[in-house]
Amino acid sequence: MYQQNSETGSLGRVVKGSWSDEEDDLLRKCIQKYGEGNWKRVPERAGLNRCRKSCRWRWLNYLKPSIKRGHFNEDEVKFIIQQHKLLGNRWSLIAAKLPGRTINDVKNYCNTHLYKKHSIENIPAPATNTMTHNTSSCVDRPESSATIKEPKWWENILVELQREEKEGKSQNCSGLDFEQDNLGQQDPNINDGMDQWLNSLKEVPNLSYQWEENLLDFDVVNLWA
């Protein structure tokens, strides 16, 4: 069993979706008889299973005889832009100040024309300009980094390291020169020692032939023993 709906004031559930021609005729007859306003009682009076909001929206945007169709003229466009800056997206207030224009028409025009025009006018710069700017900024970076001043204590350490490096190089060079000079000179004591060693070899007595022969015989006897 259906219960009475608080929105429509009639039995049954609320119908949603597109309106039929029969429903449009019922709504027209109701408005012609009772006039606009008091939308809470319109569904009951018209015999519609529609909510009051749906009835009001259908009448103001589609069925009202004074609705003006077609493109907006230049004055209307200027007025919409001016009011939109003041009121924002309050479409019902803007449409109320434009005779014959509906809330949907004003809203759709702003969403399709004004926003599209605004996006076209705010196109970002071409990629080539951005690349050129980035390239120039990259070139300038080494110059800016070169101007960075180091702390005083760090400068002192660098100076000390450079000084020690120079002193080390000078000492290495002097040592190399000394070794090269020594390589070009011969120590006379070396020659004297060599001569003494050779003379000592000459003084060693030679083994007699007889002793060598006896030594060989001794080895043979021991080998076959």
Swiss-Prot record:
This protein's UniProt keywords: Activator, DNA-binding, Nucleus, Repeat, Transcription, Transcription regulation
InterPro entries named in the record: Homeodomain-like_sf, Myb_dom, Myb_TF_plants, SANT/Myb
Phosphoprotein recorded as keyword: no
GO molecular function: DNA binding
General function of this protein: Activates DODA1 and CYP76AD1 in the betalain red pigment pathway.
Domain notes: The C-terminus (128-225) is required for transcriptional activation.
Domain of life of the source: Eukaryota
Further comment: Betalain and anthocyanin MYBs are not interchangeable and BvMYB1 cannot regulate the anthocyanin pathway in Arabidopsis.
Domain called HTH myb-type: residue spans: 11-67, 68-118
Induction summary: This dominant Y allele is highly expressed, resulting in an inner red flesh of the beet.
Organism: Beta vulgaris
Record-annotated DNA-binding residue ranges: 39-63, 91-114
Subcellular location field: Nucleus
Gene that specifies this protein: MYB1
Main subcellular location of this protein, as a coarse class: nucleus
Subunit structure: No interactions with bHLH.
GO cellular component, one term: nucleus
Protein name from the UniProt record: Transcription factor MYB1
